[in-house]
Amino acid sequence: MSHNTFGHLFRVTTWGESHGEALGCVIDGCPPGITFTLSDIQSYLNKRKPGQSKYTTQRRELDQVEILSGVIVQDDGITFVTTGTPISLLIRNMDQRSKDYSAIVHQYRPGHADYTYDVKYGIRDFRGGGRASARETAARVAAGAVARKIIPGVIVRGAVIAIGPHTINRNRWNWSEVDNNPFFTPDAEMVQVFSDYIDKVHKNGSSVGAVVEIVAENIPAGLGAPIYAKLDQDIASLLMSINAVKGVEIGDGFAAARLTGEENADEMRMGSDGKPLFLSNHAGGIVGGISSGQPIIARFAVKPTSSILIPRRSIDVDGNDVNVITKGRHDPCVGIRAVPVGEAMVACALADHYLRHRGQVGCFKR
């Protein structure tokens, strides 16, 4: 299988499978002199790791990251400094139960990558889905933690704004609520609504989808390039690469098609600090493929988990009609744990464009 690497200057290669011995990533192109600690990476992995609530898979993984190369430990024994050589990060798998998948060795799960992987490669890893599993995203989160260190002052954070048919009230948006509930939602009043809905669907043996919003702040104007190197193009590409993501929008996205020109235009005035002041942000912080200095806003849709207990019609590898039931431990709403993954992918795209801009232009205009 090819295509396990993304990025241009800040390049990340992920490796490993859901039920393999370990998974991880190699980061190439990280500048020397970047400092971080293990806890800087671990805090994001802890946000993504399974088994933290009944609304995620009950697979128990510590997701403790190990750094194998690319850094020097400082005298305090805690701080790492990058050397400019490839950074290798490893996360060991501890709680695989491959026997749970014995019934689908020769069956294709509807909505899963079983069939398409098999038809392309002539072989597939049925144990937890292999590379098609959400487990693969742990390595991305680790890479995203390093990426955050490259742009000075950058803040990248995400939240669940919809689960199934239920959507938050944006007037109640409070970032401080996101880490106080198992759904990473900024609307405290929706916690019980989400809980009741997922409980009902999961009790019936099914799963639900979600919409996640990512906001990046303190991004300098000028990142990205016209036509084939647009910043929003790369953000969309990386978000779409996340397993189970079926749609991405930047700024107002598809809603912009329902606006008039005067409604959609982000008007400008000169601020008291001598910098441009935007009166709105319909563009989501990116115009013409280049960052405007406003917050960058992206949303992505995560489909319901394909592995469910309700029988679904499918076929087996011999072409026979079958009814598939997937046992094992699966997320009733995988969109919840997609929040730190989306953050990581946006952070990696921003770090890559930051280095590309610095290499071509050399400095930033604020």
From Swiss-Prot:
Subunit structure, interactors included: Homotetramer.
A Gene Ontology BP annotation from the UniProt entry: amino acid biosynthetic process
GO cellular component: cytosol
Gene3D superfamilies: Chorismate synthase AroC (3.60.150.10)
MF terms in GO: chorismate synthase activity; FMN binding
Protein name, per record: Chorismate synthase
Role of this protein: This reaction introduces a second double bond into the aromatic ring system.
Requisite cofactors: FMNH2
InterPro entries linked: Chorismate_synth (IPR000453), Chorismate_synth_AroC_sf (IPR035904), Chorismate_synthase_CS (IPR020541)
PROSITE patterns, sorted: CHORISMATE_SYNTHASE_1, CHORISMATE_SYNTHASE_2, CHORISMATE_SYNTHASE_3
Enzymatic reactions: 5-O-(1-carboxyvinyl)-3-phosphoshikimate = chorismate + phosphate
Pathway(s) the chain acts in: Metabolic intermediate biosynthesis; chorismate biosynthesis; chorismate from D-erythrose 4-phosphate and phosphoenolpyruvate: step 7/7
HAMAP family to which the protein is assigned, alphabetical: Chorismate_synth
Binding site for FMN: R131, A132, S133, N243, A244, G288, K303, P304, T305, S306, S307, R329
Annotated keywords: Amino-acid biosynthesis, Aromatic amino acid biosynthesis, FAD, Flavoprotein, FMN, Lyase, NADP
Superkingdom of origin: Bacteria
Cofactor detail note: Reduced FMN (FMNH(2)).
Record EC number: 4.2.3.5
Family, per entry: Belongs to the chorismate synthase family.
Organism: Bartonella henselae (strain ATCC 49882 / DSM 28221 / CCUG 30454 / Houston 1) (Rochalimaea henselae)
Tagged with keyword Lyase: yes
Top enzyme category: lyase
Binding site for NADP(+): R48
